């Protein structure tokens, strides 16, 4: 056996090194399991807090937009002007372009809902062939084009939230034209129950961005807001992230809790929160490499420190055993170089204790021989 060929000190040395190595890996493994559980729990709590706070802020914003649409819906001045516009409506002609007094009355009422500070980006009332809003009035052809695109379909019975889109009626630069719209059907409740158009309450993307960009970028956590079709509401116009988040939302399904997302293309941990007043979901997501990064760094430092201590202890044991064995080596050389004429047989020795006994007997004989 190999162990029989090793000296006693070498056996102690190897056993000590193996025990130290096993201890270090056991400590690192235990620490990894404990740290993973703690990080998972911390991530769950943090994801829940971030997604809940963001969803509540978005819900308040949507409630405010809907409150304004209800106020517009019930305004008597607007109702009267819309009734007159409906009664005197001519196909292909924007009534409010031909009647500036009526336009001013409606715009004055609209401004009252958006002052003294700018609460929302824009307010508009849209007919299939008429339009009036706080901004400039586009041509009837443009209104018809937008209307016929089916932009205002799929009503839920009360109001509809459109995902982020570019306002076709805005006059500002492209980066400032991105809006989120709340649409509510409007009828002349004071005159008839006939639907006469759509109230559009627009909120700028900057407001959505302000809500969604607060206090979530920790260890590369990513926050998304998606609509019922999986389209990205925030961040806007990022094709790569849109494709990625559609895969994430498919993995989440309808679950309202934390989910380990794992596939060939994307893997990580995340949580989603469904808004109570809109078909939007807030998703907080973190990839595996970012979630496991702090854990691996901690374990790596444990292994580095433990490896350094192991090397130090191995060297200490090595030199200590070497120092202890030096007298035995000296004794062996002394006995072997003596003139007693007796050859020592070390073949049957199993341990260094046996060797020491043999050397001691030989040394005693050598001393006796010298005396004689």
Per-range role (PLM):
Residues 322-346, 350, 360-363, 367:
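Membrane-proximal alpha-helical signal-transduction linkers
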Residues 2-45:
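Extreme N-terminal signal-anchor transmembrane helix of membrane signaling/transducer proteins, especially
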Residues 48, 52, 59, 63-105, ...:
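Extracellular/periplasmic ligand-binding regions of membrane signal-transduction receptors
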Residues 103-114, 198-235, 239-240:
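Solvent-exposed, extracytoplasmic
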Residues 15, 28-33, 301, 305, ...:
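Cytosolic-side ends of inner-membrane transmembrane helices, especially those
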Residues 181-184, 195-205, 262-302, 306:
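Short, hydrophobic beta-strand elements of compact beta-sandwich sensory domains
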Residues 96-103, 107-108, 137-170, 235-261:
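Extracytoplasmic/periplasmic sensor domains and loops in membrane signaling proteins
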Residues 115-122, 128-202:
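Extracytoplasmic/periplasmic ligand-binding sensor regions of membrane-associated signaling proteins
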């Amino acid at each position: 056996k190999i162990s029989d060929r090793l000296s006693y000190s070498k056996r102690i040395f190897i056993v000590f090194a193996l025990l130290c190595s096993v201890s270090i890996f056991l400590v690192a493994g235990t620490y990894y399991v404990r740290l993973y559980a703690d990080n998972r729990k911390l991530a769950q709590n943090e994801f829940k807090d971030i997604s809940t706070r963001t969803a509540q802020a978005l819900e308040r914003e949507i409630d405010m937009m809907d409150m304004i649409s209800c106020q517009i819906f019930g305004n008597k001045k607007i109702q009267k002007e819309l009734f007159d516009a409906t009664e005197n409506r001519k196909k292909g002609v924007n009534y409010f372009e031909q009647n500036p007094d009526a336009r001013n009355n409606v715009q004055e009422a609209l401004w009252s809902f958006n002052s003294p500070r700018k609460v929302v980006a824009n307010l508009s009332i849209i007919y299939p062939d008429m339009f009036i809003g706080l901004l400039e009035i586009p041509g009837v052809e443009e209104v018809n084009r937008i209307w016929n695109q089916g932009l205002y379909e799929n009503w839920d019975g009360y109001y509809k939230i459109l995902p982020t889109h570019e306002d076709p009626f805005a006059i500002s630069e492209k980066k400032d034209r991105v809006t989120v719209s709340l649409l509510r059907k409007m009828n002349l409740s004071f005159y008839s129950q006939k639907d006469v158009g759509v109230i559009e309450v627009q909120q700028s993307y900057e407001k959505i961005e302000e809500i969604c960009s607060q206090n979530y970028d920790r260890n590369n956590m990513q926050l998304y807001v998606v609509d019922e079709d999986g389209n990205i509401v925030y961040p806007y116009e990022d094709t790569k992230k849109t494709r990625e988040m559609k895969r994430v939302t498919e993995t989440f399904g309808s679950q309202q809790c934390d989910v380990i997302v794992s596939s060939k293309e994307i893997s990580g941990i995340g949580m989603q929160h469904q808004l109570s007043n809109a078909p939007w979901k807030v998703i907080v997501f973190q990839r595996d490499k970012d979630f496991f990064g702090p854990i691996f760094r901690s374990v790596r430092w444990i292994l580095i420190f433990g490896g350094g201590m192991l090397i130090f202890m191995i060297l200490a044991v090595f030199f200590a055993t070497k120092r202890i064995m030096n007298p035995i080596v000296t004794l062996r050389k002394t006995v072997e170089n003596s003139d007693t004429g007796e050859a020592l047989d070390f073949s049957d020795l199993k341990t260094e204790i046996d060797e020491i006994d043999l050397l001691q007997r030989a040394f005693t004989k050598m001393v006796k021989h010298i005396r004689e």
